[in-house]
């Protein structure tokens, strides 16, 4: 089980303890630091919707260190990011692979960042196919549909052609931070919070 640190704040009426993720949420910071699953997606979506209800115009920060995960879970987060009325700043710390890379690229243009030693990776969707021949045909068709869908999203977010995305995604396609800028996944490599455009992070 992952240990979640707690922090203690002086509220003026005494001390209050809260887990570190709740404390970060007060500063409009959301962390995706594990495999992207349905439970994680529901938590992240709830956080994003809460922040939108608190202030529909102020930027939200999403920090990503994820090996990827389930496509439907990732797309649910992606659609929510696009649903929000505010800018969303995305940051890659460590790695943003597969669906993690797609979510990184989904941030507001000009506000997608990576730390210097981050690694990003895109690839085609995969999944184990079992069942009858009819089931296998249906599942294979669904994988091809998702492949085209994800390629279209990445093409829109990066500025690359759909054909290039499909070609590059045939195998695990790794990028360093500077390469990710050239590819269009991110906009800037930063070493310090002061280099971002968001004052709440830079202060």
UniProtKB/Swiss-Prot annotation:
SUPFAM superfamilies: ClpP/crotonase. The keyword Membrane does not apply. The keyword Repeat does not apply. One of its GO terms (molecular function) is serine-type endopeptidase activity. GO terms for biological process: protein quality control for misfolded or incompletely synthesized proteins. It comes from the Bacteria. Its EC number is 3.4.21.92. It catalyses: Hydrolysis of proteins to small peptides in the presence of ATP and magnesium. alpha-casein is the usual test substrate. In the absence of ATP, only oligopeptides shorter than five residues are hydrolyzed (such as succinyl-Leu-Tyr-|-NHMec, and Leu-Tyr-Leu-|-Tyr-Trp, in which cleavage of the -Tyr-|-Leu- and -Tyr-|-Trp bonds also occurs). GO terms for cellular component: cytoplasm; endopeptidase Clp complex. It is an enzyme of class 3 (hydrolase). Disulfide bonds: none annotated. Keywords: Cytoplasm, Hydrolase, Protease, Serine protease. The active site is at 98 (nucleophile), 123. It is found in: Cytoplasm. PANTHER family: ATP-DEPENDENT CLP PROTEASE PROTEOLYTIC SUBUNIT. Fourteen ClpP subunits assemble into 2 heptameric rings which stack back to back to give a disk-like structure with a central cavity, resembling the structure of eukaryotic proteasomes. Belongs to the peptidase S14 family. Cleaves peptides in various proteins in a process that requires ATP hydrolysis. Has a chymotrypsin-like activity. Plays a major role in the degradation of misfolded proteins. This is ATP-dependent Clp protease proteolytic subunit 2.
């Amino acid at each position: 089980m992952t240990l979640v640190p707690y922090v203690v704040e002086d509220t003026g009426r005494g001390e209050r303890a809260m887990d570190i993720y709740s404390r970060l949420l007060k500063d409009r910071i959301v962390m995706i630091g594990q495999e992207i699953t349905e439970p994680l997606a529901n938590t992240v979506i709830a956080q994003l919707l809460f922040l939108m209800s608190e202030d529909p115009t102020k930027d939200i920060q999403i920090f990503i260190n994820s090996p990827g995960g389930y496509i439907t879970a990732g797309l649910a987060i992606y659609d929510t990011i696009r649903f929000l009325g505010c800018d969303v700043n995305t940051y890659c710390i460590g790695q943003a692979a597969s669906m993690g890379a797609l979510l990184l690229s989904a941030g507001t243009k000009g506000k997608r960042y990576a730390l210097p030693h981050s690694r990003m990776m895109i690839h085609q969707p995969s999944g184990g196919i079992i069942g009858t021949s009819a089931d296998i045909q249906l599942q294979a068709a669904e994988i091809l549909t998702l492949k085209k869908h994800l390629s279209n999203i990445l093409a829109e977010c990066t500025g690359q052609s759909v054909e290039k995305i499909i070609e590059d995604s045939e195998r695990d396609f790794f990028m360093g931070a500077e390469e990710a800028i050239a590819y269009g996944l991110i906009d800037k490599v930063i070493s310090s919070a002061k280099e971002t455009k968001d004052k709440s992070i830079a202060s």
